[in-house]
């Protein structure tokens, strides 16, 4: 598991800049020296993870583990810490979410977090593709990494 206090703090702060307009997100990026790629700049849903992490560090003094969990909660990345995975998954399957497969994903998240990451990342990428939205490279890399881990695990249990 992970520290429940850290998870709670990350959960409270992870969307602290989400409601800001793109122009404000870009100003925060400039203020904190955040370099954004073209996919992030075109999508404030992704941009708020980076700016939120910086604001959480600067204004609330969160430790690096919480800052990183906030930073990666929208795209994911390969080899995430337990806290990073918990926040990513909690955000993806929160009670207000209603999409095909969310109930299965919620059950899986409580029993096998890495398997939930594989399924959640696949679902996210399929949803983006269906909507004609370019997925972030980190999300694709995360899925490839977790699928590789799944295959490694299968080899060790044969």
Regions found by a protein language model. Give the residues of each.
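Divalent metal-dependent catalytic cores for phosphoryl transfer on phosphate-bearing substrates
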Residues: 2-121
């Amino acid at each position: 598991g992970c520290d429940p206090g850290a998870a709670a703090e990350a959960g409270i702060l992870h969307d602290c800049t989400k409601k800001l307009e793109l122009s404000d997100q870009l100003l925060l990026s400039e203020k904190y020296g955040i370099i954004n790629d073209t996919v992030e700049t075109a999508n404030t849903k992704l941009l708020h993870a980076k700016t939120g992490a910086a604001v959480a560090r600067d204004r609330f003094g969160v430790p690096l583990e919480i800052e990183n969990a906030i930073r990666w909660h929208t795209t994911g990345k390969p080899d995430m810490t337990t806290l990073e995975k918990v926040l990513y998954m909690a955000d993806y399957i929160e009670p207000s979410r209603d999409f095909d497969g969310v109930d299965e994903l919620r059950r899986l998240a409580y029993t096998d977090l890495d398997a939930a990451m594989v399924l959640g990342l696949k679902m996210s990428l399929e949803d983006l593709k269906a909507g004609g939205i370019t997925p972030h490279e980190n999300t694709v890399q995360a899925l490839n990494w977790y699928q590789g881990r799944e295959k490694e695990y299968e080899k060790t249990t044969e």
